Amino acid sequence: MRILQLHCDSIEYTPTKKEIKSAEEIENPQTQRLEEIVVAFVAIEDGDDSSVAKNAISQIKNSMEKIGCKKLLLYPYAHLSSNLAKPSTAMSLLQEMESEASDLEVSHSPFGWTKSYKVQVKGHPLAESSKVVTKDSTTKDDDEDTSDALKGESTIRSYWKIMSPDGTMINIGDYDFSNHKKLEILAKYESAKQRQVDEPPPHVALMKKLAIADYEPASDSGNMRFFPNGRLMKSLIERYVTDRVKEYGGYEVETPIMYDSEHPSMVSYFNRFPARQYNIDSEGKKLFLRFAACFGQFLMANQFQMSYKNLPYKLYELTRYSFRREQSGELVGLRRLRAFTMPDCHAFCKDIPQAVDEIKVRFDLSQSVLKELGIDESDYDMAIRFTEDFYNENKSAIEELVKKHGRPVLVEMWKEKFFYFVLKWEFNFIDNLGKASALSTDQIDVENGDRYGIEFVDENNTAQHPIILHNSPSGAIERIIYALLEKAADDSKKGKKPQLPLWLAPTQVRIIPLKEEFYDFCNNLCDKISAQNVRVDVDDRNESIGKRIREAEKEWIQYILVIGEKEAGSENLSIRDRQTGNVREVSFDDFMNEINEQTSGKPYTGLNQSQHLSKRPQLMV
């Protein structure tokens, strides 16, 4: 069955003549006008049956609930398919669909008639959608263990709204997105929950071109290999995020990557966490690879004797790796992986008021971390999800988070609590293909303190279970690199020269000698610059000067020093600045200060390849 679904201000249609002998009988055909309605143009295909009809109506009703519309017109529309069912079957299934939708204000246009029509479609992100519904639409892979939370994620009742910084909430169908195009993309992407990849985003080509990462064909899909350049970048981001979390007060730990699937806490948690896991059999024991740091940290916290005076108490781990068996059609580049590196900080709080106060601190931390990583607030949009009860009891706290963001946010409100958390927010990056990916996130978890037997003693010397916050201030490290590359691709599209933040550049300065007679000078200069904690290399290959400069440009190296007789005899350095395209002379000290201004406060590591390009192998990607 194929469906084109439109949320309309109005539709007018007029039956003009019968197309087939078995067309529906109607008396006195007249123009019909319907307003504020969802119109489902439906083509019943050969092989469709009652199960398909029920599934189709279920999907239509689910999307109508999200936009707050209860008025439906079923419009038979054969032009959507070339594989139509027999007219008798089609009419019967349309009647079944209308019956299944009897709790709505439902009607249908006559079957088998030629009709003229005029339709006015609304302009919000969910106003237009298409569906292909088959008997297998809801079938899952036989070898896939799927949590109850994951199964329920597609059926949970959600209300989608937009909240402004002043706290007002508007139904998504009534919001004017004209000044918030990225938020509109996020709203459509999240509410439709379509993660399929149609084409690779630009960062995939860039991660290969810059020798950062590539697919590993000898591994499972979604498991990447990082070349020396990529490992250097990744390690610096890991160190920076870890340093910031430790400054915030997180205590770093290390926990196993696999756990007993039959451990009571694990079984219960599986069914409250929306993720697919890798399963392992070891000597008859069923194990799974962790999909977050929660398990190890919670089992560790179970061994602590805590007082309310210790709270909020924060544990932190950088998981290398966390594993999630994302569906194969959703995997692409560094955006969505099956093995990824996740900074994960849990805060154990006394109660909801303390958790609400702490989540504000972590919100500020997350904004700051992203900014220092090279991702500004204008680069992402915020989504926040909560239960209706939690919103009613903590409205001002939620509004404060939105006010901190400073722009309208996407809201998903749940009628009832289905997951272990009652609130979750995330910052979502929108890439060049209009796909959203969560970076920073935090959750308020009201179940796992009890589930894992974690306790603290309150003011009355009574044992209590803590509220737990789940924060990743950056999101997966791989996604940070993805976002930086997508930003660079967007800059290139706008005519700007793409670049990485200087502190993450695998090579920050390249020295190119004009002739072999300047090699000693270049090597000494290289050592002098390197001693200032700057990643510098020497292109001593037997290639033309033009080719070596072009290749440095292709590697996005910000500073190029071409050394000839004039430069070797000068007290100043002649610097080619990639961003301006200009060559300028500066003193050594001024040049070092310029670099330091861009890298100050960030971790440093030396080159992850030979200092001389002549000694490097050529990477074939």
Swiss-Prot record:
Gene3D superfamilies: Anticodon-binding domain, Bira Bifunctional Protein, Domain 2, D-tyrosyl-tRNA(Tyr) deacylase. Its main location: cytoplasm. GO terms for molecular function: ATP binding; threonine-tRNA ligase activity; tRNA binding; zinc ion binding. It holds the Pfam family tRNA-synt_2b. It is an enzyme of class 6 (ligase). One of its GO terms (biological process) is threonyl-tRNA aminoacylation. This is Threonine--tRNA ligase. It comes from Nitrosopumilus maritimus (strain SCM1).
